[in-house]
Amino acid sequence: MIEADRLISATGVREDEIIDRAIRPKMLADYTGQDPVCEQMEIFIEAARQRGEALDHLLIFGPPGLGKTTLANIVANEMGVNIKTTSGPVLEKAGDLAALLTNLEPNDVLFIDEIHRLSPVVEEVLYPAMEDYQLDIMIGEGPAARSIKLDLPPFTLIGATTRAGSLTSPLRDRFGIVQRLEFYNVKDLTDIVSRSARCLGLEMTGDGALELARRSRGTPRIANRLLRRVRDFAQVKSDGRIDGPIAARAMDMLDVDNEGFDFMDRKLLLAVIDKFMGGPVGLDNLAAAIGEEKDTIEDVLEPYLIQQGYLQRTPRGRMATPRAYAHFGLQRPDER
């Protein structure tokens, strides 16, 4: 199984990018949720604007689908500057980064997604650029090689990552501002779904938005993806209006339950409960029981279940929690 193939995956796909551009908030005033982050960024941005300086370099980290790219674009809009966007894997050579840096205007934003995947060679070029706004370039090869320094205009580097722990200490320490994005609560997601529906010209009730928000796993990207699928359902099966019952019927058809679990989430939990008496069960046995690769279980299926308290990893293996039994209306073995 590929994570992006799941409807409730937080990993972005091409369709997400196209629609997200149409509904993405442009300014902090339009940004819903992440209140502590927004409050701090409003102050930092206003202070930089008043001084006529570039904003300090900013690192944004957190799970996928929470709005890191959106926030980077908002920062550029609020500062009234241009933004150039790239990603860690794309910057293969030092020259790739140098080409971007030398084309920046004063106070512009350079946004690097998946910054934890920068190669060491590229990262070395980034250090003096971030600290001193200077670019060290090697001219020639072998004994005749020499280094020249180019002055760069002041700029803001915004790095985004889902794995802040994978960043090297020298790189992490060069960011003046570090912000972590948290999963969204149902109220904020309801507001996000309602706003997205308005942007797409859809008629949606509060109950309809709430129904989607509850099943979105705390992630706006999933909420917006579910909205698009419910839009299709409402268009074909109803009059196009999305209310609570229509949203619930669409989610049932798509096999996404009230907790945002899909078929594979439920299959894993029920395997632990029914086949292994709630656990503990080793990863090899669990993989064989549900017919999935071990890497898929560890990287795709388990994280959300563990985070929400439905599954535990212990030294002896995986165990279903009381919350997992309650979700399926089952009694734990010690209660029978």
Curated annotation (Swiss-Prot):
EC number: 3.6.4.-
Domain of life: Bacteria
Record key words, sorted: ATP-binding, Cytoplasm, DNA damage, DNA recombination, DNA repair, DNA-binding, Hydrolase, Nucleotide-binding
Functional summary from the UniProt entry: The RuvA-RuvB-RuvC complex processes Holliday junction (HJ) DNA during genetic recombination and DNA repair, while the RuvA-RuvB complex plays an important role in the rescue of blocked DNA replication forks via replication fork reversal (RFR). RuvA specifically binds to HJ cruciform DNA, conferring on it an open structure. The RuvB hexamer acts as an ATP-dependent pump, pulling dsDNA into and through the RuvAB complex. RuvB forms 2 homohexamers on either side of HJ DNA bound by 1 or 2 RuvA tetramers; 4 subunits per hexamer contact DNA at a time.
Residues holding DNA: R313, R318
Residues engaged in binding Mg(2+): T69
Predominant location: cytoplasm
Assembly mode: Homohexamer. Forms an RuvA(8)-RuvB(12)-Holliday junction (HJ) complex. HJ DNA is sandwiched between 2 RuvA tetramers; dsDNA enters through RuvA and exits via RuvB. An RuvB hexamer assembles on each DNA strand where it exits the tetramer. Each RuvB hexamer is contacted by two RuvA subunits (via domain III) on 2 adjacent RuvB subunits; this complex drives branch migration. In the full resolvosome a probable DNA-RuvA(4)-RuvB(12)-RuvC(2) complex forms which resolves the HJ.
Cellular component annotations (GO), alphabetically ordered: cytoplasm; Holliday junction resolvase complex
Gene3D superfamilies for this protein: 1.10.8.60, P-loop containing nucleotide triphosphate hydrolases, Winged helix-like DNA-binding domain superfamily/Winged helix DNA-binding domain
Cell location: Cytoplasm
GO annotation (BP), single: DNA repair
Domain notes: Has 3 domains, the large (RuvB-L) and small ATPase (RuvB-S) domains and the C-terminal head (RuvB-H) domain. The head domain binds DNA, while the ATPase domains jointly bind ATP, ADP or are empty depending on the state of the subunit in the translocation cycle. During a single DNA translocation step the structure of each domain remains the same, but their relative positions change.
GO molecular function, one term: ATP binding
Any one Pfam family match given in the protein's UniProt record, by short name: AAA_lid_4
Residues given in the record as ATP binding sites: I23, R24, G65, K68, T69, T70, E131, D132, Y133, R174, Y184, R221
Name of the protein this chain belongs to: Holliday junction branch migration complex subunit RuvB
